[in-house]
From Swiss-Prot:
GO terms for cellular component: cytosol. InterPro entries: YaaA. Disulfide bonds: none annotated. This is UPF0246 protein ABBFA_001173. PANTHER family: PEROXIDE STRESS RESISTANCE PROTEIN YAAA, PEROXIDE STRESS RESPONSE PROTEIN YAAA. It comes from Acinetobacter baumannii (strain AB307-0294). Belongs to the UPF0246 family. One of its GO terms (biological process) is response to hydroperoxide. It holds the Pfam family H2O2_YaaD.
Amino acid sequence: MLALISPAKTLDYETALPTDEFTQPRLLEHSAQLIDVCRKLSASEIASLMSVSEKIATLNADRFRDWKPEFDFSNARQAIYAFKGDVYTGLDAYHLKDKDIDFAQQHLRMLSGLYGLLRPLDLMMPYRLEMGTKLKNTRGHNLYEFWDDIITNQINEDLAAIKSELLVNLASDEYYKSVNEKKIKAEIVKPVFLDQKNGKYKVISFYAKKARGLMARFIIENQLNKAEDLKAFNTEGYYFDADNSSAKELVFKRDEQQA
């Protein structure tokens, strides 16, 4: 199976890296085109476009200016260690074993507004460019039009490389919209995580994001390859709810913790 996760806004370029192994992103010629567009934006325009503060906008204007497609450890780090957010708290990549990282390199992918599709060990320079950003570019009015079928085609290549016909969608809707489902040459399964609150089960963003990371870790550590195997996921109190699941959507619930 091949699992997809979203990137994170928060980045970590400080923590000591557990490995010096790396690969280069495969869609950099497209990234460079986006950088050319972004470099023409002022900090104020970035602030408005991305709905961020002037401080963050200025930081990212500097990042766009300094970006270059020659990545090494002086200016970049591996994607799986660079992203720091709720999903990556669940994934906890720094404590994965070498064999787990090897498996992840083949079976885990991170969607990205700037880099398209990243493997765990792909080096990346720091950036902020969310997939939902309405950035006018040479191919359209937003990043979905820019990436078009490029990400989808790369996913299909990666599925073929591991001889898999199963794609596990652990990404947010914003990022998964960059994938053309109709052209994916595989069965697609989406795990959904519901937490109980005031007696009702619902998606609670913080918990759901972390759970997606936990599921990615579960897939990696157990080297899963069948959709049926996902149902055994029981980390941090989640359990499979067969009654509310379907072939395409696997529902996992967690009961409210009593004080």
